[in-house]
């Protein structure tokens, strides 16, 4: 029996000039998602997706590499300017932001959207190293 030829679906190139970069920086990883104004994801990347494993995912260098990769994917869609929303306490916040700027994006605004409780849930216990 002959196998049917599978069609390869190509991602259609959207021509979007401006968008929002969501930088989620945790203690263990840094994830960058670039969306359009409505919130539809255009490109994403993370330190783990770039091949960093374990504690190396949480470094600023890993965040920089992930941001460069995400920027390259977004520029293929014609994106030129970004608003940046930074979330989380991790070490990759500033380096990801610098990498997006160095990639050639015009950054129009930077917002910190880290959720801060008004004395909500009890936090986890402090680490004793």
From Swiss-Prot:
GO terms for molecular function: rRNA binding; structural constituent of ribosome. InterPro entries: Ribosomal_uS11, Ribosomal_uS11_bac-type, Ribosomal_uS11_CS, Ribosomal_uS11_sf. Coiled coil: none annotated. GO terms for cellular component: ribonucleoprotein complex; ribosome. Keywords: Ribonucleoprotein, Ribosomal protein, RNA-binding, rRNA-binding. GO terms for biological process: translation. Located on the platform of the 30S subunit, it bridges several disparate RNA helices of the 16S rRNA. Forms part of the Shine-Dalgarno cleft in the 70S ribosome. Part of the 30S ribosomal subunit. Interacts with proteins S7 and S18. Binds to IF-3. Belongs to the universal ribosomal protein uS11 family. PANTHER family: 40S RIBOSOMAL PROTEIN S14/30S RIBOSOMAL PROTEIN S11. This is Small ribosomal subunit protein uS11. It comes from Brucella anthropi (strain ATCC 49188 / DSM 6882 / CCUG 24695 / JCM 21032 / LMG 3331 / NBRC 15819 / NCTC 12168 / Alc 37) (Ochrobactrum anthropi). The lineage of its organism: Bacteria, Pseudomonadati, Pseudomonadota, Alphaproteobacteria, Hyphomicrobiales. The gene is rpsK.
